[in-house]
Amino acid sequence: MTLDLNPNDMSHVVAADRAHVWHHLSQHKQYETIDPRVFVEGKGMRLWDATGREFLDAVSGGVWTVNVGYGRESIADAIRDQLVKLNYYAGAAGTVPGAIFAQKLIEKMPGMTRVYYSNSGSEANEKVYKMVRQIAARHHGGKKWKILYRDRDYHGTTIATLATSGQDQRAIAYGPFPDGFVRVPHCLEYRKQWDVENYGERAADAIEEVILREGPDTVGAIVLEPVTAGGGVITPPEGYWQRVQEICRKYDILLHIDEVVCGLGRTGTWFGYQQYGIEPDFVTMAKGVASGYAAISCTVTTERVFEMFKDAPEDGMSFFRDISTFGGCTSGPVAAIENMRIIEDEGLLDNTVAMGERTLANLNALMEKHKVIGDVRGKGLFCGAELVADRASKEPMDEKKVQAVVADCLAQGVIIGATNRSLPGFNNTLCLSPALIATADNIDRITDAIDNALTKVFA
């Protein structure tokens, strides 16, 4: 098939998109009167659309994914070379890039030993849920089957992962959901539920209260984001994670850390949990693993977890009876190997720390200038600014005005994000997650655009 792509006329591409593509998270009624945006090319942190307009991308592909930036020829070359050698074999066997990336990944994750490949963050998390249920059936007599999740966290788009969605608007109309998934309170100190000095410990103690209410012998695992993403860019309060770890050990509850957003450098360490001294049983990751150059996700476990599935070889049902077809595609791990090399060789973890500090400093300066900013939060290049109608009452800013800020930044040529269709009444946080290659000039342009937008929208 020959594609007629005239670089000077992309109207037929836009027409094909409008006629046939069902876009994610989009109300298509708007496309009866306006064209959908079609991106054509990317380089570094810059994007160009079908009209030729240039944008600075402050959200790494819209969903915190393109960690090393666009246009990485070395990743594309590595994928091409691998695909002509061996493109695929099912995950029941091994491949060279699968083995090599697993080894390199585990070297970055002390205490973890095994890597299970699949395609998306939703899948990676669902694998854990299945593992927890199988462990409950084989090792706990069917008990310890419940999985706890946190208000405001998000873990995926399948029915089971939506059952653990702490973002209610993501789950509306997709139920009923399966049993055994139980919510625990959020840990956003800006909107704290208890007027105490040691809020972090109190928020963690609330998890223990849920465990005791449900019965410790029924709870098998808890899934948590190290830094909550779409629920408002929530960094954990002091003392929170240490207490969570203690509670998990006290009640023999497996700790599942969802690194789908934070993983591979986003917070300034290889993984977000490493910022807080956590020792997890499961770690899941996707987005930044290959920076969007190939589809890959990983479910990483300890040897203790792995051994629970090989202790009875005479039982033909004892192993993990799961498969993910495209978890066997070699493009994922070979892209991930090169992605990891780039992060190391270019010092992107250190850059993330430095540019993250600059981003937070700039946002805090904007908070001094604009009273609509109620709180600034973040870790590394993963930052948010919560907009409020009134600082004293912390009344959330109207969602339409928050989206007007996003739209004005877009009009200036800067793509930022905001919590969207997640939390009823609380979709009021601007979200920034630029590529780990961001420069000081990039950061300043992003925050200057926000400054201009806030001035215009709230004049």
From Swiss-Prot:
GO cellular component labels: cytosol
Repeat keyword on record: no
Record's keyword terms, sorted: Aminotransferase, Pyridoxal phosphate, Transferase
Organism superkingdom: Bacteria
The enzyme's E.C. designation: 2.6.1.77
Signals that turn on the gene: Induced by growth on hypotaurine.
Gene3D superfamilies in the cross-refs: Aspartate Aminotransferase, domain 1, Type I PLP-dependent aspartate aminotransferase-like (Major domain)
Pathway as given in its UniProt record: Organosulfur degradation
Substrates-to-products reaction catalysed: hypotaurine + pyruvate = 2-sulfinoacetaldehyde + L-alanine; taurine + pyruvate = sulfoacetaldehyde + L-alanine
Record-level Gene Ontology MF annotations: pyridoxal phosphate binding; taurine-pyruvate aminotransferase activity
Broad class of enzyme this protein falls into: transferase
Presence of keyword Transferase: yes
Modified residues (N6-(pyridoxal phosphate)lysine): K287
Cofactor(s) the record lists: pyridoxal 5'-phosphate
UniProt cross-references to Pfam families, sorted A to Z: Aminotran_3 (PF00202)
Stated family: Belongs to the class-III pyridoxal-phosphate-dependent aminotransferase family.
Chain's role: Converts hypotaurine to alanine and sulfinoacetaldehyde, which desulfinates spontaneously to acetaldehyde and sulfite. Can also catalyze the degradation of taurine into alanine and sulfoacetaldehyde, which is stable. Has 2-fold higher aminotransferase activity with hypotaurine as the substrate.
Name the record gives this protein: Hypotaurine/taurine--pyruvate aminotransferase
Organism listed in the record: Paracoccus denitrificans (strain Pd 1222)
